[in-house]
Amino acid sequence: MDIVDSQVHSNVIGTDTTLAIMDAIGIQSVLVDEYLGPAENPSQLLPAYELPGGVFRPIGPNAEAAALAHPDRFAFLMRVSALDPRLDGWVEVLAASPHLKALRTVVFGDREVAAFKEGGFDRLFAAARRHGLPMFVTCPRMVPHLGPYARKFPDLQFVIDHCGAAFEAPRGRALIDDTVALAEYSNVALKWAHAPSFLSNQPYPFPDLEPLLAQALNAFGRELMMWESDYTVSRHRASWAEALFTMRHSPVLSADDKAWILGRTARNLLNWPAPEKPFSRRPLHPHRPGGAAPKFD
């Protein structure tokens, strides 16, 4: 099976270690979202630099380097602030990279929240549409506000991040009702991500996720659902292998459902064809002078 993980912060563990885990558990490709953590202002996420006016511009040098070195295994997305004063020019620069597959916006902070609710993300979404880039949107507790944008930009592919769940909800108490309501829009897709962290109270294989997975599948259909482990952030609840095999062994999903959600949807929506030749498993303990074998769980 051609498996694509549609978001990993691989810069946290390094490209070599990421590849070793991918090889070990059978993942062909990863969409990298470079992330280090929050800045002093927790609504701003690093790596980024501050622009005049206090807006942060995210960057992803390690993500792009991984994609350049291993184009069959990695591509990347870039976070973009809707408040960036040079938004149009910045998106044009980003879109020139052959390995950029999507933009992502994270609606944190009072200014971003107010702008999102008031239609202030039009310029960002217009730029994404102009360059043919899908738009990943993280907007916890504000998912219904995405609906007007989906109507206004019917030819832009939106992807709801992290199941649309509220980050601060007690574990296993977050709901996806607002998210599945947006399945009425044919240009809105869902990333099934962080589900063990936000939606489950049980240990692996997280059987309490199955009714919610079925709810999402019935609403969106398999052609508009993609899987994401977000491994480096969610590993307190599930190892990378557990996040994957929860899906591979799900009794709710048919074999065709799994093929779409675990790879084909991402390939289609991100315009990222599968490589002609699948990866070959590399040794788990490569011999590197003075180097130790990578460790992972």
Go through each PLM region and give its residues:
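Catalytic pocket-lining loop regions of alpha/beta-barrel enzymes
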Residues: 114-226, 274-296
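Active-site phosphate/pyrophosphate- and oxyanion-stabilizing loops and adjacent acidic/basic residues
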Residues: 19, 64-65, 92, 147, ...
